[in-house]
């Protein structure tokens, strides 16, 4: 087992004895974008995360990282054991659903994929499954917008119900590069799905590009005067998972949000966390998301103490206001 980084003191419990959010690193940072041609294998990534002191990893389900359909009962048990041997837990799973956009494929096809994902996650002791709409921002072309929206709601309701049986949450990561990327659309959808184990994956970079720049929203973008901070306050009650990274409003390949090292962008993290408030404090995990960042190998090392400080100072502020 690799030695864990021990150079920084850690707060692991609050005064009332409850745990604080643990910090994970997303594995897609080493397989997408600048790493796509020479992706790190998953074992190398896990060793890096452990060596640098992360509490856990968030699994990118895109090959060559663990794809749920590639595993048997024996091999999934071995994968879980190898991750645990490094002292790491798993914060969530982001499956590869590119061929099954939920508003466009037959519902049975999407639900079949979700059954495989649920089986994999149950074996891996993963309680959070990340999804998106897959469809481009312009919306589905094969069917009317209203019909597509109704199908999306039905499919995610049924998916959430299936995951609930195993104690799992389904979280939607809204972002500029996919359909339903306006603040009002995001709020409406999560309320229309209306399942207790369905919620939002709030990514600080996507929130910034969406609220402050109206990225890929089309004509008459829906901007929020308070940017990502106002967006956080608007969605706080629906947030079930959190990705933190900086943003300057730019897009990767004119598609979706660039993810910049902390301090290289415009996000006011203390204000954003304060706007999220109690829901953020009660999350089990905060995940560092370096998707598409060419300097990840260096900057993900530097990010961990920054995020720890943000977390600990945020919890101190919450405690000082009487919130536990």
PLM region descriptions:
Residues 28-33, 60-62, 95-98, 134-136, ...:
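Active-site beta-loop-alpha junctions enriched in small/polar residues
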Residues 1-126, 195, 199, 274, ...:
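N-terminal pre-domain/capping segments
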Residues 57-60, 90-95, 127-134, 170-173, ...:
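Short beta-strand segments at enzyme active-site cores
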Residues 285-306:
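A short, acidic, flexible beta-alpha connecting loop/helix-capping segment that sits on the rim
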Residues 6-12, 82-86, 101-202, 298:
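Active-site acidic/histidine proton-transfer and metal-coordination neighborhood
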Residues 63-73, 96-113, 135-148, 215, ...:
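Surface-exposed, active-site-proximal loop segments in enzymatic domains
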Residues 56, 93, 156-261, 266, ...:
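Acidic/histidine-rich catalytic cores of soluble enzymes
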Residues 39-41, 71-77, 107-115, 145-156, ...:
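Charged helix-capping and loop-helix junction motifs
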């Amino acid at each position: 087992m690799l030695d864990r980084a021990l150079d920084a003191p850690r707060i692991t419990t609050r005064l009332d004895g409850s745990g604080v959010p643990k910090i994970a690193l997303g594995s897609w940072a080493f397989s997408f974008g600048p790493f796509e041609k020479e992706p790190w294998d998953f074992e190398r990534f896990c060793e890096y995360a452990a060596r640098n002191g992360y509490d856990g990893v968030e699994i990118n389900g895109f090959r060559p990282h663990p794809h749920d359909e590639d595993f048997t009962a024996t091999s999934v048990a071995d994968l879980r054991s190898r991750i645990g041997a490094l002292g790491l837990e798993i914060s969530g799973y982001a499956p590869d659903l590119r061929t099954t956009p939920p508003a466009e494929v037959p519902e049975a096809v999407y639900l079949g994929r979700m059954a495989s994902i649920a089986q994999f996650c149950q074996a891996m002791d993963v309680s959070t499954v990340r999804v998106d709409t897959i469809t481009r921002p312009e919306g589905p072309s094969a069917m009317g917008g209203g019909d597509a929206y109704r199908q999306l709601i039905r499919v995610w309701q049924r998916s959430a119900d299936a995951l609930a049986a195993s104690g799992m949450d389904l979280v939607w990561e809204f972002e500029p590069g996919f359909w339903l990327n306006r603040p009002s659309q995001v709020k409406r959808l999560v309320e229309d799905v209306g399942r207790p184990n369905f919620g939002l994956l709030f990514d600080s970079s996507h929130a910034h590009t969406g609220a402050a720049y109206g990225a890929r929203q089309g004509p008459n973008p829906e901007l929020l005067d308070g940017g990502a901070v106002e967006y956080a306050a608007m969605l706080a009650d629906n947030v079930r998972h959190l990705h933190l990274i900086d943003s300057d409003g730019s897009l990767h390949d004119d598609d979706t949000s660039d993810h910049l090292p902390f301090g290289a962008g415009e996000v006011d993290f203390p204000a954003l966390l304060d706007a999220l408030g109690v829901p953020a404090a009660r999350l089990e995990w905060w995940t560092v998301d370096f998707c598409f960042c060419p300097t990840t190998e260096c900057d993900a090392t530097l990010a961990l103490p920054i995020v720890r400080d943000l977390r600990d100072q945020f919890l101190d502020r919450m405690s000082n206001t009487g919130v536990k």
